[in-house]
Amino acid sequence: MRFVASLIGISLVCVQVFADELDLSLNNDALRLQYVYKVESSGLNLDAGWLHHSDNGDILHAGVHLVDLASGGRDKLEAGLGGRAVYTNGDLSGQSGFALPIGGFLRFTPMAINRLSVAGSLYYAPSILAIGDMDKYQEVTLRVSYNVLREADLYLGVRYARGDYKKDVPDTRFDKGMHVGMSLRF
């Protein structure tokens, strides 16, 4: 737990130096903190995050995505494709492992109601991209956001994050269900 606290402290210091986006979401059992750094004029986004579930364990990730507009019309459709390096520590299963899931995200903002957006992401690592005790990893997120301030959104979402392990232990659902969150852009 000291490692996680140190990681959060370092992340908060980095936010003040390089900040682009800080995302926080939670429900009664889980908390997720994510930082996104947008590399200027390259279309690359670098991100790091931590998901903690009070009973099921932790997920740490670092990722890279190529991001651009996927639409040519008035309505804005932003897409990002890439991957992540993921470390999982399942408290209930006693297992941990690494995975390299590939995937991406879509974010749709209709011009007529441009304060509202719908977003989703999907990441999957089959056994060939799993290392150690991990057999596969999957994460799906959907959310509806409202742009409260120019640089701040509030959202309601649903998330499913699961790690499957090679040994005879139950698969770990790190989070499943609804959450609320906010996204701050600097």
Give the location of each predicted region.
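Cleavable N-terminal export/targeting peptides
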Residues: 1-21
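Short glycine/proline- and aromatic-enriched beta-strand/turn motifs that initiate or cap beta-hairpins
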Residues: 16-68
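Sequence/structural signature of outer-membrane beta-barrel proteins
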Residues: 31, 51-57, 69-71, 84-92, ...
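Outer-membrane beta-barrel architecture
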Residues: 34-36, 61-70, 103-107, 143, ...
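Repeated loop/turn-to-beta-strand initiation elements of outer-membrane beta-barrel proteins
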Residues: 41-46, 69-79, 112-118, 150-154
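Transmembrane beta-barrel strands of outer-membrane/channel proteins
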Residues: 24-28, 46-52, 64, 81-87, ...
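Residues that define the transmembrane beta-barrel architecture of outer-membrane proteins
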Residues: 27-31, 42, 56-62, 75-77, ...
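Outer-membrane beta-barrel "beta-signal"
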Residues: 146, 173-186
